[in-house]
Amino acid sequence: MYRIKDEWGEFLVRLARRAIEEYLRTGREIEPPKDIPPELWEKMGVFVTLNRHNVPPQAALRGCIGFPLPIYPLVKATIKAAIYAAVDDPRFPPVKLEEMNNIVVEVSVLTPPELIEGPPEERPKKIKVGRDGLIVEKGIYTGLLLPQVAVEWGWDEEEFLAETCWKAGLPPDCWLDEDTKVYKFTAEIFEEEYPRGPVKRKPLIPQSQD
């Protein structure tokens, strides 16, 4: 059962775009609208992803930042994550306003992370590509990958774990260590079909088990 109605997802995507474009024009963070459903004021984790339009998924990313834990009300978290994704992702130069004409905005609303218990070697059996996102923690190192990333790259569960370890700056087999914590979460994902276009819920299709 969906927590986020389709119309709420559309609202969040439009809000994210407006937050970015207003910040790029004026340097100001917009305030959330007042007349929105109370559910969107609940604290939830959220990520905003910016993808270049008409570019293969593996090369499309232009920025992605968010909050894995529910520390802000969803509307405020969406505004902040959108701005950070546009100007503070250390992997990319800041987005320019004119670039937004060729960028598709995507919003992922996250469930709270759930620690994967049990022996490390059983972790691949406890996650599912097409459903779960992952967080890997070891010492001061942390890495997160959203559920859609594994689908877009065609990874299986072990590859997904290894890539999340890489994202954390750790060896790819660190998920086999007892002192590595692995969390899973799910996400409801909404994206523009094209820049400023209709917003749709993004389905995640698990890999076939051939």
Curated annotation (Swiss-Prot):
InterPro entries: AMMECR1, AMMECR1_dom_sf, AMMECR1_domain, AMMECR1_N, AmmeMemoSam_A, Uncharacterised_MJ0810. Residues 7-201 form the AMMECR1 domain. PROSITE patterns: AMMECR1. HAMAP family: AMMECR1 (MF_00645). NCBIfam families: AmmeMemoSam_A, PRK00801.1, TIGR00296 family protein. This is Protein PF1979.
